[in-house]
Design a protein with these regions (language model features):
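DNA major-groove recognition helix of helix-turn-helix/homeodomain DNA-binding modules
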Residues: 54, 58-75
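Short alpha-helical DNA-recognition segment
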Residues: 25-49
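Helix-turn-helix DNA-binding elements, focusing on the entry/boundary residues of the two helices
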Residues: 17, 28, 44, 59-62
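Residue-level detection of the helix-turn-helix DNA-binding "recognition helix"
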Residues: 22, 36-37, 52, 81
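Flexible coil/turn residues that form the inter-helical turn or adjacent wing/linker of helix-turn-helix
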Residues: 13, 24, 40, 55-58
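Short, charged recognition helix plus adjacent turn
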Residues: 2-7, 67, 74-86
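A short, Lys/Arg-rich alpha-helix, primarily the initiator
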Residues: 1-23
Length: 86
């Protein structure tokens, strides 16, 4: 029986978020602070949980993450698209 990718990896944002945040030279604290300035109630602890695939990302959080990181949703989800194609 094939193991489902989504069963263990329900948050497809995790890998891309960690990668892009580090590429931008941002700490989890800095990212959380920028999100809070946009009115998103996320602290460093929640950023860490998202990056460890322990917390889902809400749709408005996804949009705000993209804005803060200055990337498109497609760029943030690039790891998912590379795994499964377009």
């Amino acid at each position: 029986m094939n193991k489902s990718y989504f069963h263990d990896n329900s948050n497809i944002v995790a890998e891309g978020l960690r990668r892009l945040r580090k590429e931008k030279g941002m700490s989890q604290e800095e990212l959380a602070a920028q999100l809070q300035l946009m009115g998103v109630d996320i602290d460093q602890r929640l950023i860490s949980k998202i990056e460890r695939n322990e917390r889902f990302v809400k749709d408005y959080e996804l949009a705000c993450l993209c804005r803060v990181l200055d990337v498109t949703e497609r760029e943030l989800l690039a790891d998912f698209y590379e795994r499964f194609g377009d």
